[in-house]
């Protein structure tokens, strides 16, 4: 019969050791909860941390940027500026379109923001032009967020106007109804319309004006209430043929009579079915297409949204004619799924490596099975808590679980090693489990809570970076906490049932060889440790030098914000001279497209030319380049971008700007390159003075690449200067002049054709093919007060001037954005420093305000808080350790291990050519929590030896180091191998995972070597200091 230790032996583990059935069932419950939770967890690339963002688009065809700014954007901005919770408001006013982007505070629900935006639009309605074709339309979408899915609709048999009509009514509306979809845009602008092209000479010969034609059309095509007849027996609804539906109907329309003969519209104009806007076009590869871009709502799960669209597509395409082909050209979820799969594989690999290292040290199958059960149980149990907290399976949470693999096994290893030690001394398994678990319980609690304490500052990081890493920190903390519970319950219970003196003594050739090897290693370590303890000041000097080296490396290592990911999609902007026409721009775009499609890494391409809510100017073309899957191409995205830019450099008159799409989108504007810097002023004149010199200086900086500005003030404008006195004498008002010009050159939407499914427009313009350019103004005719026809040139002169192609505002003030990339041999930190130096050298006046935007602004914010984040982690850990040890001194001894981890991590990043970005900083903070466990295990046993066996401090710490050498080495290697798959990652999303693995592997390798020697030395030095203080202040010590 086994003699059990006293009832108090075993600590918190005693109940679970003595009740194996209850313990087993409790663990099964945790396992089942985790498995069920996993099935309900959504999948995404990163935690959902989007700012609530709403875009408001107002179209005013034919209006110049100045008119759009003053008549539409400014009234809207004044109302939007009064909304509570608004973080930033930016706007872009271009020819015919106003786009206002509203970014709200993270804490404001998107639905609340939507209500405020709608109220502001309603308040501004009376201030907007009365002839707006449509009121402002808002969408819950961030315009800078790349589409989650891009579809191309093509047909070789049906006109594109009919294709767009079918897509808009049958496909786009249904996709818009999918939960999570924020906006569906149809690039290509081929909405059906009846186009009326006036023949200026024919109208003039008949003594008519364009205003006469416009009035006749609007009066002839109406759709209004007519009432009903209600008689004694029945009611009759009234209707009439007041609607004209086809181009032929309009062609036969009588617009005037002369000498008793009718003048029909077809006599003075060509009337045909066409597109509502003839200056828009989209292409899929090199085929004319309607390109459908689907963007998600901020905060919506991208995987769920894309899956819903995929399920719906077959049914939607069945409703289209067979000649209409719908092709999915890009789906961001493909790379997201691949990235998550790669991370899941690395997680499984980490578990396998950790179990392998356990067997290598324990050399016993039953002893290996125990932590082999504890690791997956701790990780799977975490899924249940993640569901409760509304987390998702994403790259960061999977990275947390991968790193946790090395953490969670530590507790089980420490418990097993301690229980095995007593069994090898001859204790019975049950007694050894009670005694070993009770002895190690405080160490497990210290390890767990001190490690969780390191993660606490991550929960208080501000802004979007804090939200981003909250899931990472909480997931890791939960896994560590569950691991501690498992290690104090299931692990000792399994040790009591599965381990025995015979099983531990049973050895094969490998076991005997490895045992001899470890004994020799421990003996060598013991000899070196004795020498180190005899030279404490030299060792202390080494420890202090690591602290100094950490500070030096921290200052000089290149710094970045977030790794640039290879998601297989490149966003591009093609820039041409500011006065380029639509036809010329379309031709240049086709030349560039043919070059891009020849690249072996490119799978498909979509491009768009024209001005609408997504493209600000006619001299810009938008491109989306879809690359082949990573395993089907030889080069990463940055290499492909460099190659494409070099190839396009040979095309005259264009500049191509490219940037890879990212899962993390902080910007609210679509810029040409990755990072933005803004200049804001009180007037456009101030910007025109200071933008060119700053731009030229930045373009000369080697730390910057692809520097460009959205400041475009060299667009050609015809300024019509009316002699108001002459016009007034003839009875011609400025409204008459504006109407005549708008009728001729504005693609004016003058009437609406209503059908059961949709509404179509009648577009009025002047045929300028015979008289292109400024000569077309000679054909403009006005009606005087006496009914005479007056040429515009009789009362006005025309001057050619330059004008901005668009007017941009930031928080209601004029702004220009300078975009830039960072060359491969420089970091974002160096680029930011170069921009700030260039700014200081120019000595801007006080009315010029500068600011980084988007990722570069977040980088500045994160860089400023990084040092405080590390300090907060150290302070939090000191407080927890001080409370646990009831000592001011011992926590300092434990924390003395931290500089070695910092040196190792920073050196590894520097040697690997990686930047110190937020991912790497998280790794360093985790190292703070990991490396101190070596000191905790040493100090716990040294203090116990001093207290219970009366050993002197030197002998106690020496024996503790030798006794704990094997579990220290085992746990460190387990943590290192847990991070190794991340460091060696090569698949999709590897850019995100690799910095974390590099920093942790480097830090663990160096700290493992140094802390085995520096910790005992510092322990003895602080012990001497403590004794000195006790002798110096005995009364205070007694009172304490």
Curated annotation (Swiss-Prot):
Topology within the bilayer: Multi-pass membrane protein
What cystine linkages occur within this chain? none
For this protein, what is any one GO molecular function term? xenobiotic transmembrane transporter activity
Cellular compartments annotated: Cell inner membrane
Q: Which domain of life does the protein's organism represent?
A: Bacteria
Keyword terms, alphabetized: Cell inner membrane, Cell membrane, Membrane, Transmembrane, Transmembrane helix, Transport
Alphabetical list of InterPro entries matching this protein: AcrB_DN_DC_subdom, Acrflvin-R, Multidrug-R_MdtB
Give me the Gene Ontology terms describing cellular component: plasma membrane
Keyword Manganese assigned: no
SUPFAM superfamilies documented for this protein: Multidrug efflux transporter AcrB pore domain, PN1, PN2, PC1 and PC2 subdomains, Multidrug efflux transporter AcrB TolC docking domain, DN and DC subdomains, Multidrug efflux transporter AcrB transmembrane domain
Q: What is its main location?
A: membrane
Provide the transmembrane region boundaries: 16-36, 342-362, 369-389, 396-416, 440-460, 472-492, 537-557, 863-883, 888-908, 911-931, 968-988, 998-1018
Q: Which family does it belong to?
A: Belongs to the resistance-nodulation-cell division (RND) (TC 2.A.6) family. MdtB subfamily.
HAMAP family from the xrefs? MdtB (MF_01423)
What quaternary arrangement does the UniProt entry report?
Answer: Part of a tripartite efflux system composed of MdtA, MdtB and MdtC. MdtB forms a heteromultimer with MdtC.
* Protein's name in the database: Multidrug resistance protein MdtB
**Which lineage?**
Bacteria, Pseudomonadati, Pseudomonadota, Gammaproteobacteria, Enterobacterales
């Amino acid at each position: 019969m086994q003699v059990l230790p006293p009832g108090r032996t075993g600590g918190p583990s005693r109940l679970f050791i003595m009740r194996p059935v209850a313990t087993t069932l409790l663990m099964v419950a945790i396992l089942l909860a985790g498995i069920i939770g996993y099935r309900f967890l959504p999948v995404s690339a990163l935690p959902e941390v989007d700012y609530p963002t709403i875009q408001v688009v107002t179209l005013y065809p034919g209006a110049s940027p100045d008119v759009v700014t003053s008549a539409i954007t400014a009234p809207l901005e004044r109302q939007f500026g009064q909304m509570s919770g608004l973080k930033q408001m930016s706007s872009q006013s271009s020819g015919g379109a106003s786009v206002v982007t509203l970014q709200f505070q993270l804490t404001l629900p998107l639905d609340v923001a939507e209500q405020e935006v709608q109220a502001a639009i309603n308040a501004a309605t009376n201030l907007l032009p009365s002839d707006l074709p449509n009121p402002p339309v808002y969408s819950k979408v961030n315009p800078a967020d790349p589409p989650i899915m891009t579809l191309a609709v093509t047909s070789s048999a049906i006109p594109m106007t009919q294709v767009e009509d079918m897509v808009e009514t049958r496909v786009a509306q249904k996709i818009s109804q999918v939960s999570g979809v924020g906006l569906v845009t149809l690039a290509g602008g081929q909405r059906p319309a009846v186009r009326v092209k006036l023949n200026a000479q024919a109208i003039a010969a008949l003594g008519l004006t364009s205003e006469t034609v416009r009035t006749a059309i609007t009066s002839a095509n109406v759709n209004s209430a007519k009432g009903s007849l209600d008689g004694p027996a029945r009611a009759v609804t009234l209707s009439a043929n007041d609607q004209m539906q086809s181009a032929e109907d309009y062609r036969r329309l009588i617009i005037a009579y002369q000498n008793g003969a009718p003048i029909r519209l077809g006599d003075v104009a060509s009337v045909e079915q066409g597109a509502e806007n003839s200056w828009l076009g989209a292409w899929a590869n090199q085929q004319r297409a309607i390109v459908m871009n689907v963007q998600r709502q901020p905060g919506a799960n991208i995987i769920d949204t894309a899956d819903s669209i995929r399920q719906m597509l077959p049914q939607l395409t069945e409703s289209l004619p067979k000649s209409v082909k719908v092709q999915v050209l890009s789906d961001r979820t493909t790379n997201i799924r691949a990235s998550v799969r790669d991370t899941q594989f690395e997680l499984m690999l980490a578990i396998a490596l950790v179990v392998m290292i356990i067997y290598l040290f324990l050399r016993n199958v039953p002893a290996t099975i125990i932590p082999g059960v504890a690791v997956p149980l701790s990780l799977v149990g975490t899924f249940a808590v993640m569901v409760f907290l509304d987390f998702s399976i994403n790259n960061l949470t999977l990275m947390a679980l991968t790193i946790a693999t090395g953490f969670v096994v530590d507790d089980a290893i420490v418990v097993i090693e301690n229980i095995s030690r007593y069994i090898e001394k001859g204790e019975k398994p049950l007694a050894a489990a009670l005694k070993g678990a009770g002895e190690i319980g405080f160490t497990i609690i210290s390890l767990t809570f001190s490690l969780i304490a390191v993660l606490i500052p991550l929960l208080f990081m501000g802004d979007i970076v804090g939200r981003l890493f909250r899931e990472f920190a909480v997931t890791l903390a939960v896994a560590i906490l569950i691991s501690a519970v498992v290690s104090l319950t299931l692990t000792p219970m399994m040790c009591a049932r599965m381990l025995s003196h015979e099983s531990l003594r049973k050895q094969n050739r490998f076991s005997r060889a490895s045992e001899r090897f470890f004994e020799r290693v421990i003996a060598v370590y013991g000899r070196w440790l004795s020498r180190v303890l005899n030279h404490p000041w030299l060792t202390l000097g080494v420890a202090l030098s690591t602290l100094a080296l950490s500070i030096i490396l921290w200052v000089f290592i290149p710094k970045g914000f977030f790794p640039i990911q290879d998601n297989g999609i490149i966003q591009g902007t093609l820039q041409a001279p500011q006065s380029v026409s639509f036809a010329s721009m379309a031709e240049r775009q086709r030349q560039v497209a043919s070059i891009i499609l020849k690249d072996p890494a490119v799978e498909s391409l979509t491009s768009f030319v024209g001005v609408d809510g997504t493209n600000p100017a006619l001299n810009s073309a938008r491109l989306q380049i879809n690359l082949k899957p990573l395993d089907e191409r030889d080069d990463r995205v940055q290499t492909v971008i460099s190659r494409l830019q070099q190839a396009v450099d040979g095309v005259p008159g264009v500049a191509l700007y490219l940037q890879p799409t990212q899962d993390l989108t902080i910007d609210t504007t679509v810029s040409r390159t990755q990072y933005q810097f803004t200049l804001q002023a009180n007037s456009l004149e101030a910007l025109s003075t200071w933008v060119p010199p700053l731009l030229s200086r930045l373009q000369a900086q080697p730390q910057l690449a692809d520097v460009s500005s959205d400041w475009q003030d060299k667009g050609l404008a015809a300024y019509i200067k009316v002699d108001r006195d002459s016009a007034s004498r003839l009875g011609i008002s400025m409204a008459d002049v504006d109407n005549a010009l708008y009728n001729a050159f504005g693609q004016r939407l003058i009437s609406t054709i209503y059908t059961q499914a949709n509404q179509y427009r009648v577009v009025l313009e002047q045929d300028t093919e015979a008289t292109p350019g400024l000569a077309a103004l000679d054909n403009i005719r006005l009606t005087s007060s006496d009914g005479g026809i007056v040429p515009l040139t009789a009362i006005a002169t025309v001057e050619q001037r330059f004008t901005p192609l668009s007017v941009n505002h930031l928080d209601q003030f004029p702004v220009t954005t300078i975009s830039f990339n960072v060359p491969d041999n420089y970091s974002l930190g160096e680029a930011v420093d170069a921009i700030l130096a260039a700014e200081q050298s120019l000595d801007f006046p006080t009315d010029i305000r500068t600011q980084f935007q988007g990722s570069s602004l977040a980088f500045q914010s994160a860089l400023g808080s990084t040092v405080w984040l590390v300090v907060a982690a150290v302070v939090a850990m000191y407080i927890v350790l001080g409370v646990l040890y009831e000592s001011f001194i011992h926590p300092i001894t434990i924390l003395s291990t931290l500089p070695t981890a910092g040196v190792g991590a920073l050196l590894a990043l520097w040697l690997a050519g990686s930047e110190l970005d937020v991912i790497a900083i998280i790794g360093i903070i985790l190292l703070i929590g990991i490396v101190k466990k070596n000191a905790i295990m040493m100090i716990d046993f040294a203090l116990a030896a001093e207290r219970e066996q009366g050993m002197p401090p030197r002998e106690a710490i020496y024996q503790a180091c030798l006794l704990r050498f094997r579990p220290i080495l085992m746990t460190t290697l387990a943590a290192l191998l847990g991070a190794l798959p991340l460091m060696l990652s090569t698949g999709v999303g590897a850019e995100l995972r690799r910095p974390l693995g590099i920093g942790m592997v480097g830090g663990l390798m160096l700290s493992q070597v140094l802390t085995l020697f520096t910790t005992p030395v510092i322990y003895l030095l602080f012990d001497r200091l403590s004794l000195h203080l006790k002798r110096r202040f005995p009364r205070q010590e007694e009172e304490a």
